[in-house]
Every structure is written in C-alpha cells, then in structure tokens.
C-alpha cells in the first residue's frame, strides 16, 4: 500500500482531531482541540499527515522545538510531541517514514538531536523508538499530593 506524507493544513483539522482521539482516547475533546490552529501557525512546530491511496488520512506526527530534551547535549532539540498510525495499517513502515520526515524538519531548523517520550507501559512505542535508533535516556515517575 502506498502513502503520501505532507504538511497538515487547516482543512485537515477534523481528521487530525479524530486521530488525536485515537492516540489519547481518555483525553477530553476540548483538550485535544484547543490548540490545533496555534500549532499549525507556529513556525517552531510541524504537523505532518499521511494519506492512503484513497486520500484518507491514516497517520500523523507532531514535532516541535524544545530548549531541552532529556539526555540531549545540544539545543534546540527536535521533539516528537505526538505520533500515531491507524492500528489497521501498522507494520507497513509508515510510522518510520513519518519519523524520518519529522527528523528532516528538525535538521532544517538547526537541530542536531531529536527526542521523544512515551508512557512506561507502552511497550509498542518503546520498541518502535528503539528500532528507529533512539536510545532510552531516563525513566520518570510523576507524583502528586492533594493539599
């Protein structure tokens, strides 16, 4: 199956939001929807979408610039903020291609390193990152206490 990867536009917002819901199913829609226009307009943020042969959007990656990334030695750092491939087409190397596009964007922005994160229990994501040459930098546990 062939896919086309391109920069997201405002016309992609509804499909992009649908895929964000697939990535973060427990997040309120208001949280997932509130910053889409800002992200598309931000020169230090890039959203790339992938469509199948029928033109349907089936995957996306969001990348941004950060001053710091855990384990990184340079600044700014390209950062994979979100990465999603429809579960029915995983394993076809589309996720890898999206990461390569995001890495290319970060290089164009002057970055020498790319970073990312995932939940500790997301073994699929951890394996995908490792397969693409990423190294685990650290593990982090967040704490909270109600006062």
State each model region's role:
Residues 13, 17-31:
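Helix-loop element at the rim of GNAT/NAT acetyltransferase active sites that forms part
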Residues 1-11:
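Conserved N-terminal entry element of GNAT/NAT acetyltransferase domains
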Residues 106-118:
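Conserved GNAT acetyl-CoA-binding A-motif
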Residues 67-80, 90, 137-138:
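A conserved beta-turn-beta hairpin within the catalytic core of GNAT-like acetyltransferases
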Residues 27-49:
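Active-site rim helix/loop that mediates acceptor-substrate recognition in acyltransferases
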Residues 96, 108, 120-138:
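Conserved active-site alpha-helix within GNAT-family acetyltransferase domains
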Residues 49, 56-65, 79, 84:
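Conserved beta-strand in the GNAT
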Residues 85, 91-104, 127, 131:
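Conserved acetyl-CoA-binding loop-helix of GNAT-fold acetyltransferases
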């Amino acid at each position: 199956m062939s896919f086309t990867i391109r920069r997201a536009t405002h016309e992609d917002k509804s499909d992009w939001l649908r895929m964000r819901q697939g990535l973060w199913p427990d997040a309120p829609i208001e949280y997932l929807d509130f910053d889409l226009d800002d992200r598309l307009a931000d020169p230090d943020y890039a959203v790339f979408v992938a469509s199948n042969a029928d033109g349907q959007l089936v995957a996306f990656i969001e990348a941004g610039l950060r001053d710091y990334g855990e384990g990184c030695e340079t600044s700014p750092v390209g950062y994979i903020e979100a990465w999603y491939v429809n579960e029915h087409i995983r394993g076809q190397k589309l996720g890898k291609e999206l990461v390569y596009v995001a890495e290319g964007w970060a290089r164009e922005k002057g970055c020498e390193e790319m970073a990312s994160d995932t939940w500790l229990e997301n073994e699929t994501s951890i394996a995908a990152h490792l397969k693409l040459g990423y190294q685990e930098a650290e593990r982090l546990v967040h704490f909270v206490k109600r006062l």
